[in-house]
């Protein structure tokens, strides 16, 4: 594995921000644009999905009934491996219930394989590893 140039690193960071924004703003078209058509996503005990459409549909069904959510993606490392780029990023997600009261906070990391397409970088494979989850009680 080798380092990537600044432009590639920034493009990958922008992709991950679009992913988080797509979920948090319930912009399912934006979220879908982050994945290849044949993307494989493994979120551990949460589930696994094949294809950008399936991933997006699951996220829509999971998040539409809820209140606000905030996905923060940090500590990004990016390296090159042949024609693909690999990235690891930390995620800290807060998801609130429909009344923005009780919710959950989950922390973990994404291990991604990304490919360059005609319209920019996309996630081709993702593995989410949850490190911690806790219930958030209303104030």
Named regions from a protein language model:
Residues 1-37:
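Short, low-complexity N-terminal intrinsically disordered segments enriched in polar/charged residues
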Residues 8, 12, 51, 106:
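Hydrophobic (often cysteine-bearing) scaffold residues that line and stabilize catalytic clefts
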Residues 28-93:
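A solvent-exposed, acidic/Ser-Thr-rich amphipathic alpha-helical stretch
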Residues 71-73, 105-110:
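Short, surface-exposed coil-to-beta transition loops
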Residues 86, 107-137:
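Short beta-strand edge/turn micro-motifs at domain boundaries
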Residues 93-95, 130-131:
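Beta-strand elements of well-folded, non-transmembrane domains
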Residues 98-101, 137:
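Flexible, membrane-facing loop/turn or short amphipathic-helix motifs
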């Amino acid at each position: 594995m080798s380092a990537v140039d600044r432009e590639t690193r920034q493009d990958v960071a922008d992709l991950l921000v679009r992913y988080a924004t797509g979920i948090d703003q319930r912009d399912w078209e934006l979220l879908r644009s982050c994945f290849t058509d044949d993307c494989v996503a493994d979120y551990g005990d949460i589930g696994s999905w094949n294809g950008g459409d399936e991933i997006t549909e699951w996220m829509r069904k999971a998040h539409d009934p809820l209140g606000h959510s905030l996905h923060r993606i940090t500590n990004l490392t990016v390296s090159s491996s042949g024609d693909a780029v690999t990235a690891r990023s930390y995620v800290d997600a807060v998801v609130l219930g429909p009344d923005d009261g009780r919710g959950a906070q989950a922390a973990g990391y994404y291990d991604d394989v990304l490919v360059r397409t005609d319209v920019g970088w996309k996630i081709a494979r993702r593995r989410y590893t949850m490190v911690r989850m806790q219930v958030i009680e209303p104030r």
